[in-house]
Design a protein with these regions (language model features):
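N-terminal ordered "arm"
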Residues: 1-58
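Charged, alpha-helical interface segments at or near domain boundaries
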Residues: 40-137
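A contiguous, surface-oriented mixed alpha/beta subdomain in the mid-to-C-terminal portion of proteins
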Residues: 115, 124-162
C-alpha cells in the first residue's frame, strides 16, 4: 500500500489526489490499482508499518488540471468536492478520492447515488462545510475600532474563510 500525504490547502489536496490517481493507473510503471492507494492529510498521528509514505507538495498547474477534470463531470460534483476538501476532517481527502473513482465511472448520475457510502460521505462533508460557512456569515458580529475600521473575530473549524 502506498499512502500519499499532503498539506492543508486546496492546492495541496488537489495535487495529492491527482498524483495518487496517476500512481493507481500506473502511468510510468506497473498499474497498482485504486485499492492500493490511500490519501492522508498531515500531520499523521499513527504510521502504518507496512505502507510506503509519499509527501506531495501542491502544484498550481496540477491543481488546475484536477479542477477542470472534476468540473467536466458536473457543477454539483465540483461543488461537493470543493466543499469536502475544505473540511477539517482528516479523512476528507481520501473520501473525495473514493468519490471521484465513482464519479468518473458513473458521470453526473453520482449526484443522486446517496446509497453509496463514498457519495454519502462527500455529501456529509460538503454539507457540514456549507452549514458552517452559512453560520459564520449569518452570525458574524462586527465592532467598530476608532469609528474607522470594523473588526469581527471568528474561529471556524473548517476552511470557510473563502
Amino acid at each position: 500500500m502506498k499512502i500519499f500525504t499532503c498539506g492543508d490547502s486546496y492546492e495541496d489536496k488537489a495535487t495529492c489526489i491527482y498524483r495518487a490517481w496517476e500512481y493507481a493507473l500506473g502511468l510510468g510503471q506497473g498499474a497498482a490499482g485504486h485499492g492500493e492507494v490511500k490519501i492522508l492529510r498531515e500531520p499523521i498521528a499513527q504510521l502504518d508499518m507496512f505502507a510506503e509514505y509519499v509527501h506531495i507538495d501542491g502544484e498550481q498547474d496540477i491543481a488546475e488540471k484536477f479542477t477542470r477534470s472534476v468540473r467536466s463531470i458536473s457543477p454539483v460534483v465540483y461543488r461537493n468536492v470543493f466543499y469536502a476538501l475544505l473540511s477539517d476532517c482528516g479523512e476528507a481527502v481520501d473520501a473525495v478520492y473514493r468519490y471521484l473513482i465513482l464519479a468518473f465511472r458513473e458521470g453526473r448520475r453520482v449526484e443522486h447515488m446517496l446509497i453509496r457510502p463514498e457519495a454519502m460521505r462527500v455529501m456529509e462533508l460538503s454539507r457540514n462545510v456549507s452549514n458552517e460557512s452559512h453560520k459564520f456569515r449569518e452570525m458574524a458580529r462586527f465592532t467598530s475600532v476608532d469609528r474607522k475600521v470594523y473588526v469581527c473575530h471568528i474561529e471556524p473549524k473548517c476552511d470557510v474563510s473563502m
